[in-house]
Amino acid sequence: MRILGIDPGLQTTGFGVVDVDGHRLRYVASGTVRTTGRATGLALGDLPGRLKVLFDGVSEVAARYQPSTAAVEIIFVNVNPQSTLLLGQARGAALTALVNANLPVAEYTALQMKKAVVGHGRAAKSQVQEMVRRLLELPGLPGTDAADALGLAITHAHAGAAMARVGEVAQLTRRQHAMYKAGRSY
């Protein structure tokens, strides 16, 4: 099974792709989708343009690596409500790209991911990076956004099957995908 992990962000969205064979994990790819800067030519204020870049970037990653499922971080309510709304829009663009690619999507909180990867939910980003490096036998530390995305893929590899059986992971079925694509939600 191939899992695509997504750590959504409006400026930088991390992605990580992991193959799972039984209990063995194999690193495939990781990186980021950036929505501002020279490569995009977009300014911080161009929200619709940045969301399109994010949608297109996640769509391209899904098409290139052909995952069988995806895991996305659930956002938390920030102190700044405006930041939370912007992050929610970025997450929505990423989720829409995954659903458009007909991928089942599992969702995990940062606390769940950190607990699964490091062993406790209050782990620092550097601890997540180091454990992802060790678990996937990487030669160096991945960037923080890519490490979080790889951590989400690892979390789903270890917990997804068992959690799905007891209904703790929200997954979209193929029938639901078809209904959403057709504009129906009954």
UniProtKB/Swiss-Prot annotation:
Gene3D superfamilies: Ribonuclease H-like superfamily/Ribonuclease H. Pfam families: RuvC (PF02075). Its cofactor is Mg(2+). InterPro entries: RNaseH-like_sf, RNaseH_sf, X-over_junc_endoDNase_Mg_BS, X-over_junc_endoDNase_RuvC. Mg(2+) 2 binds at E73. Keywords: Cytoplasm, DNA damage, DNA recombination, DNA repair, DNA-binding, Endonuclease, Hydrolase, Magnesium, Metal-binding, Nuclease. One of its GO terms (biological process) is DNA recombination. CDD domains: RuvC. It is found in: Cytoplasm. The keyword DNA-binding applies. The RuvA-RuvB-RuvC complex processes Holliday junction (HJ) DNA during genetic recombination and DNA repair. Endonuclease that resolves HJ intermediates. Cleaves cruciform DNA by making single-stranded nicks across the HJ at symmetrical positions within the homologous arms, yielding a 5'-phosphate and a 3'-hydroxyl group; requires a central core of homology in the junction. The consensus cleavage sequence is 5'-(A/T)TT(C/G)-3'. Cleavage occurs on the 3'-side of the TT dinucleotide at the point of strand exchange. Belongs to the RuvC family. Homodimer which binds Holliday junction (HJ) DNA. The HJ becomes 2-fold symmetrical on binding to RuvC with unstacked arms; it has a different conformation from HJ DNA in complex with RuvA. In the full resolvosome a probable DNA-RuvA(4)-RuvB(12)-RuvC(2) complex forms which resolves the HJ. This is Crossover junction endodeoxyribonuclease RuvC. The gene is ruvC.
